[in-house]
């Protein structure tokens, strides 16, 4: 009798675990929401707040050869910026913070809500910080503009040290950049966007931002 009780207990535990895994799987596809504050402005991700001491070695290019963001380097060249601080460009919530290896290394993605001055509508945008030496944040963490989120890296020596920085209007990209059209409806020119949104009105109310929008990532995902 005790044998069957143990078997039933084991089966129940297995069903609970399976249920949790199923819910987690569904959540990765679902269109949940997260509460977040509206950004009161955007700053540059290095040399805060104005990018002092850094330059853009390579910018956004949506035609061949494709480059989906900006590469920020320290003005002293080489690996002199290795380990330099990287900051979030605006208030937001971390949606991704993993080591995905390959050509990326450590990657942080943060979702931001802001009121568009041109339309007065609340909009959302993702910022991505790639090749980091260290990550200082975790998924689900709320961050304030200028908060330390990581340090400049080289993807374990694959590249000279630099920050790969992207901003995306399309919230469904995640780590699947080839899944959407190469145009400015999906991608933002990072520096242009920041310059146009340096100072926004402070609003104390929070908004519901889309969450769970990224396709499931099948590659390596470490912390």
Spans of model-derived segments:
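Short histidine-centered loop motifs in beta-beta connectors
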Residues: 80-82, 87, 116-146
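Bacterial N-terminal signal peptides
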Residues: 14-25
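A residue-level detector for short acidic-glycine micro-motifs
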Residues: 96, 131-134, 151-154
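Active-site loop architecture of trypsin-fold serine endopeptidases
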Residues: 152-164
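Surface-exposed, glycine-biased beta-strand/turn segments
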Residues: 26-106, 115, 145, 154, ...
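Short edge-strand/loop segments of extracellular domains
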Residues: 112-117, 172
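N-terminal secretory signal peptides that target proteins for export/translocation
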Residues: 1-9
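Short peripheral tails and domain-boundary helices/loops at the edges of structured domains
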Residues: 120-127, 168-198
């Amino acid at each position: 009798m005790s044998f069957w009780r143990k078997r039933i207990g084991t089966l129940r535990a297995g069903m609970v675990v399976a249920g949790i895994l199923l819910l987690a799987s569904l959540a990765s596809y679902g269109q949940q929401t997260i509460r977040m504050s509206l950004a009161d402005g955007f700053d540059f991700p290095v040399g805060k707040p104005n990018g002092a001491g850094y330059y853009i070695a390579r910018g956004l290019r949506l035609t061949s050869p494709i480059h989906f963001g900006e590469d920020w380097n320290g003005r002293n060249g080489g690996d002199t910026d290795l380990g330099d601080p990287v900051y979030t460009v605006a208030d937001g919530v971390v949606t991704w913070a993993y080591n995905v290896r390959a050509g990326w290394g450590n990657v942080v993605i943060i979702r931001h809500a802001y009121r568009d001055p041109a339309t007065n509508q609340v909009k959302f945008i993702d910022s991505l910080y790639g090749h980091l030496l260290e990550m200082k944040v975790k998924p689900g963490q709320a961050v304030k503009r200028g908060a330390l989120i990581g340090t400049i890296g080289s993807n374990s020596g694959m590249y000279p040290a630099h920050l790969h920085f992207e901003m995306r209007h399309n919230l469904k990209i995640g780590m699947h950049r080839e899944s959407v059209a190469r145009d400015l409806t999906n991608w933002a020119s990072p520096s242009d966007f920041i310059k146009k949104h340096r100072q926004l009105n402070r609003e104390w109310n929070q908004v519901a931002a889309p969450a769970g929008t990224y396709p499931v990532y099948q590659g390596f995902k470490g912390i």
